[in-house]
């Protein structure tokens, strides 16, 4: 497979000084920027559905090993057990993603489109009551390449940090997530954010709480790394229903394979730093991950559906 996700090179801009086929394109495009203030109005009810559909997503998973004794404290009181990937070690991941969805209804001032960014802090676990039916002996590498065929091992979402209030509300009410509102500052390669060296394969993102204090930030550099396909979908997400006191699973179908990076160099490709926020997610990240080095990286990017090229003189 290709070594890394690639973005197309920037266009060869024409100076307009020749009689070639391309108009003079600006090297930069100026766009309007608004500072907005909002006043929350009363909540409104909307129909619920048994499935939620993403129109597009760019997702990154940073995988770490963690002692089972540490992970048990997070899941055993909720009727779940951390999966043993060998050597008394379980696994956790940081899943940062950018997503967009179509709501199918819009009005002036409401485009009917939703874009949101999230971080999930996940512990790999399963419902304790089905322990006899959970496959044993899987290594983390096997899991990341082939997944769990029984789909009983899943991501228990210790925290979900999201920058969209609607997504926060739906995550809590429909999917029973431990979800809360944050902000993000990020710059990642993509089809509309092409890069030249040396940062062509560098991903940066930071998560801040509602006071502006940083919870964590990460930098990922994929230069020189090669990936193998990972058959992870469908991914099982685990939550906890406080009313019935039972673990709850939901199935997230990514319609494609994951790019999975497993080389030893992965350990030096990520810089993870914690901020000064007093948010409990920061404290839990330090507790379960701390200064550990990642052992794997996974990525999934949904395919672009339309590519529109720049204009040219059509009368030549």
Walk through the language-model features, giving the residues of each.
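Generic detector of ordered, mature protein regions
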Residues: 73-79, 84, 88, 105-110, ...
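Interaction-surface and assembly-scaffold signal
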Residues: 3-46, 157-316
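N-terminal ordered "arm"
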Residues: 38-40, 45-98
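Aromatic- and glycine-enriched beta-alpha-beta binding-site module
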Residues: 97-211
């Amino acid at each position: 497979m290709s070594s890394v996700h690639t973005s197309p090179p920037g266009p060869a801009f024409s100076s307009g000084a020749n009689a070639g086929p391309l108009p003079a394109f600006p090297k930069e495009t100026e766009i309007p920027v608004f500072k907005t203030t909002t006043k929350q109005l009363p909540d409104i009810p909307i129909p619920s559905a048994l499935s939620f559909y993403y129109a597009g997503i760019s997702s990154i998973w940073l995988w770490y090993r963690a002692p089972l004794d540490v992970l048990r404290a997070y899941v055993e009181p909720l009727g779940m057990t951390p999966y043993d990937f060998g050597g008394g070690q379980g696994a956790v991941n940081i899943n940062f993603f950018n997503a967009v969805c179509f709501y199918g209804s819009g009005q002036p001032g409401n485009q009917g489109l939703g874009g949101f960014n999230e971080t999930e802090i996940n512990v790999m676990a399963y419902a304790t009551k089905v322990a006899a039916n959970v496959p044993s002996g899987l290594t983390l590498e096997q899991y990341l390449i082939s997944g769990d065929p029984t789909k009983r091992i899943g991501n228990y979402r210790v925290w979900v940090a999201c920058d969209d209030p609607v997504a926060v509300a739906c995550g809590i009410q429909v999917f029973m997530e431990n979800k809360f509102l944050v902000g993000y500052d990020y710059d990642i390669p993509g089809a509309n954010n092409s890069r030249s060296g040396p940062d062509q394969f560098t991903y940066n993102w930071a998560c801040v709480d509602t006071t502006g204090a940083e919870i964590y930030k990460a930098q990922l550099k994929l230069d020189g790394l090669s990936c193998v396909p990972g058959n992870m979908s469908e991914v099982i997400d685990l939550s906890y229903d406080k009313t019935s006191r039972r673990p709850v699973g939901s199935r997230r179908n990514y319609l494609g394979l994951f790019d999975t990076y497993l080389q030893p160099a992965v350990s030096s490709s990520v810089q993870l730093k914690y901020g000064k926020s007093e948010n409990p997610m920061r404290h839990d990240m330090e507790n379960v991950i701390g200064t550990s080095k990642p052992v794997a990286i996974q990525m999934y990017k949904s395919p672009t559906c339309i590519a529109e090229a720049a204009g040219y003189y059509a009368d030549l």
